Amino acid sequence: MKLLTGLVFCSLVLGVSSRSFFSFLGEAFDGARDMWRAYSDMREANYIGSDKYFHARGNYDAAKRGPGGAWAAEVITDARENIQRFFGHGAEDSLADQAANEWGRSGKDPNHFRPAGLPEKY
């Protein structure tokens, strides 16, 4: 529902043309897919201390798609952090995750968070 509300808001309030609206949708979809790929890789790697790297990488890849990708990355990461906070995960870890998310979304190199020994596949 938030996705639909956000898209309608962008369309009506910001005066987005139909062509750029569909471009935004495509970027958002591809950005969400980038986030899912980073999450899947994190689960597959199962490497201690690598979560910040995968957070930054997913946000970086999504933001490279354009404004729609960056928007999708922000919505997904905020939702994930809010859910984790609700279930009692530490606030300190959540702040570190959000810093890694913002690092990636701002276009900075996600390898800054890459732990030593993480296989090159990732």
UniProtKB/Swiss-Prot annotation:
Domain of life of the native organism: Eukaryota
Tell me the segments the record calls region Important for amyloid formation: 19-45
Chief subcellular location: secreted
Q: What induces it?
A: Upon cytokine stimulation.
The reported effect of R80A is: Reduces affinity for heparin and nearly abolishes association with HDL
Please describe the organ and tissue distribution of this protein's expression. Expressed by the liver; secreted in plasma (at protein level).
Establish whether keyword Transferase is in the entry. Answer: no
**Gene3D superfamilies, alphabetically?**
Serum amyloid A protein
Q: Where is this region: Disordered?
A: 98-122
Which keywords annotate this record? Answer: Acute phase, Amyloid, Amyloidosis, HDL, Heparin-binding, Methylation, Secreted, Signal
Q: What does the PTM comment of the record read?
A: This protein is the precursor of amyloid protein A, which is formed by the removal of approximately 24 residues from the C-terminal end.
Q: Which GO terms describe its molecular function?
A: G protein-coupled receptor binding; heparin binding
Record's keyword annotation contains Transferase: no
**Matching InterPro entries:** Serum_amyloid_A, Synovial_Prolif_Regulator
Swapping D78N leads to an effect described as: In allele SAA1.4
**Subcellular location per the Swiss-Prot or TrEMBL entry:** Secreted
List the propeptide region positions: 95-122
Residues with the modification N4,N4-dimethylasparagine, per the entry, are N101
Quote the subunit structure annotation: Homohexamer; dimer of trimers. Can form amyloid fibrils after partial proteolysis; the native, undenatured protein does not form amyloid fibrils (in vitro). Apolipoprotein of the HDL complex. Binds to heparin.
Family to which this protein belongs: Belongs to the SAA family.
What is this protein's function? Major acute phase protein.
Q: Which disease is it linked to?
A: Reactive, secondary amyloidosis is characterized by the extracellular accumulation in various tissues of the SAA1 protein. These deposits are highly insoluble and resistant to proteolysis; they disrupt tissue structure and compromise function.
Task: Spell out the protein name for this chain.
Answer: Serum amyloid A-1 protein
Gene this chain is encoded by: SAA1
